[in-house]
Design a protein with these regions (language model features):
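Conserved AMP-binding/adenylate-forming
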Residues: 48-95, 214-215
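Conserved ATP/PPi-binding loop(s) of AMP-dependent carboxylate-activating enzymes
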Residues: 308, 328, 335-338, 346-370, ...
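Conserved AMP-binding/adenylation subdomain of ANL enzymes
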Residues: 188-211, 218-256, 270-275
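Gly/Ser/Thr-rich phosphate-binding loop
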Residues: 232, 254-259, 268-330, 341, ...
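Conserved AMP-binding A3 loop
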Residues: 32-35, 157, 165-192
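Conserved structural elements of the adenylate-forming
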Residues: 39-47, 161, 180-204, 215, ...
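Conserved pre-ATP/AMP-binding loop-to-beta segment of ANL
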Residues: 15-18, 151-169, 175-176, 201-211
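AMP-binding/adenylate-forming catalytic core of the ANL superfamily
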Residues: 353, 358-359, 381-467
């Protein structure tokens, strides 16, 4: 099973259906792209990248990096590189040039794509231009225009199931990112399972077509996997980014939004003040929040608008999806996929299956520590209920260990703080031997009486807690708490 092979089967099935909604960056006009047209573009991009591959010395690996905002051309070149036998390496477009070049040197990236917004920064562009030989630093817009003029490659490279086709930086809230190698089999598992599950619905003509808007970054596994999953369902997507999202939100009557929780929170806040945004949200039936946990406040806000909140469980190391099946349940991450299995070992969630990464690039020690006896140890704490639903309860490395040997789970305390409707964001941590909490509240930032209500809530909460768990220091922030690139609160 290979990624390109699975996508070919999907495209052949839905050939005439709409696959993508695209916005022209110059005119702002929208256009519709069918599955067949999309795959023609991917095949043409594969021709372009095949020629680029031939231009490399034999001993140089064929890897293509990118630092750019989300867009349809980004995704086409993403697949075009893989279909030409290359390894795609998406990097966070907000990285400075120094950090981009640091990872490029560590991984070995002979070609680097860059977005127009990134190259508009003259200092950034100058640093990358100085580091790359002529013809190796490539503007994304120019590459897409050139690849569209190429003849489609008839024999796309499929490779072997264990071939590395994607390298991603592991996401986290602390420490240096590790480089994850995802294989053909890893990336194929989810879209293939979704596609096969829907075969009866396709044959009976009962398959509904949904229009989706996705804004999760393509440098993250949570950006690409939902796209191929929706394509497997025969649905269409508009790939948006933070710069264009509000404009794109009103482009169609989208039934599903695929976003980070922090982004969804901002949309709902805007809808409270803007009747037009509130009207746009009336067509939305479901919101899939990935990249970070949804707070109880956000879940309730979605319910209040008759929008179904959904979340899946997965990591970069598990190629995104571990759980996604079953009807929604508040607080749960659905049930496990058929292509993998999970177990709880000493409270830790462990995963084994086709979606588990090959390993960390040039880091056998970290790989051996993470994958033991075939099981990937996620570092997340959780439980599985009698119906197979997974609940994530915390992160092992976040556990606060006090000098008296007592263990305190910050996530458990954070859930208790979120019971206060005034709390929008919170992080619990240790300050010496005391438990502390940082809280952001929109209401409290504007009204001191609301801040006093939060303090009173925490005081009352402490009366119900063991002494070691009581929150001794409370900091109310007037600004949102710091987050990583996928919206996870930093600790």
């Amino acid at each position: 099973m290979t990624f390109v092979g699975v996508l070919e089967e999907i495209v052949a099935c839905y050939r005439e259906r709409e696959a993508f909604i695209c916005r022209d960056t110059a005119s702002g006009d929208l256009s519709s792209v069918s599955f067949e047209e999309f795959w023609t573009s991917v095949s043409s991009a594969a021709t372009y990248w095949t020629e680029k591959r031939k231009a490399l010395p034999q001993n140089e690996p064929f890897r293509v990096g990118i630092a750019a905002d989300n867009s349809y051309p980004y995704f086409v070149e993403y697949l075009g590189v893989i279909a030409a036998g290359g390894v795609f390496v998406p990097l966070n477009q907000s990285f400075g040039a120094e950090r981009v070049l640091e990872f490029a040197a560590e991984i070995g990236i002979p070609y680097m794509l860059a977005g127009a917004a990134q190259l508009a920064d003259s200092e950034y562009a100058a640093e990358l231009t100085a580091a790359y030989p002529p013809g190796r630093l490539l503007p994304l817009d120019e590459v897409f225009a050139a690849s569209e003029q190429c003849e489609p490659l008839k024999d796309l490279h499929k490779g072997e199931p264990d071939d590395t086709i994607l390298m991603l930086l592991s996401s986290g809230t602390s420490g240096r990112s590790k480089i994850v190698e995802n294989t053909n089999e890893n990336l194929s598992a989810y879209p293939n399972e979704v596609f096969e599950q829907l075969r009866p619905a396709r044959e009976s003509g009962e398959l509904h077509h949904y229009e989706n808007l996705i804004v999760l970054p393509l440098f993250h596994i949570g950006g690409v996997i939902p796209i191929v999953g929706e394509l497997a369902r025969g649905n269409s997507l508009l790939i948006s980014n933070a710069r264009q999202f509000l404009q794109d939100l009103g482009a169609r009557k989208f039934e599903k939004l695929i976003v980070a929780p922090a982004m969804m929170k901002r949309i709902l806040e805007r809808a409270e003040k803007n009747a037009k945004v509130a009207e746009i949200l009336e067509s939305v039936r479901e919101v899939l929040c990935l990249g970070a946990a949804m707070s109880p406040v956000l879940i309730q806000a979605l319910h209040d608008r008759d929008i179904l909140p959904r979340t899946y469980y997965g990591l970069t190391e598990t190629t995104g999806t571990v759980t996604y099946r079953g009807p929604y349940r508040d607080g749960a991450c659905c049930t496990v996929a058929d292509f993998c299995e999970i177990k709880i070992e000493d409270e830790e969630i462990c995963v084994r299956g086709k979606n588990v990464m090959k390993g960390y690039y040039k880091n056998p020690e970290a790989t051996a520590e993470a994958i033991r006896d075939g099981w990937f140890h996620t570092g997340d704490l959780g439980r599985i209920d009698e119906d197979g639903y997974l609940y994530v309860t915390g992160r092992r490395k976040n556990i606060i260990v006090l000098s008296n040997g007592e263990n305190v789970s910050p996530e458990v305390l954070e859930d208790k703080l979120y019971a206060c409707p005034l709390v929008d964001e919170c992080v619990v941590y240790a300050d010496g031997e005391e438990i502390a909490a940082n809280i952001f509240s929109v209401a409290a930032a504007a009204d001191e009486t609301k801040a006093e209500e939060i303090r009173a809530f925490v005081k009352q909460l402490n009366r119900t807690l063991p002494r070691v768990e009581q929150i001794q220091k409370l900091n109310l922030s007037a600004e949102e708490l710091p987050k990583n690139s996928t919206g996870k609160l930093l600790r």
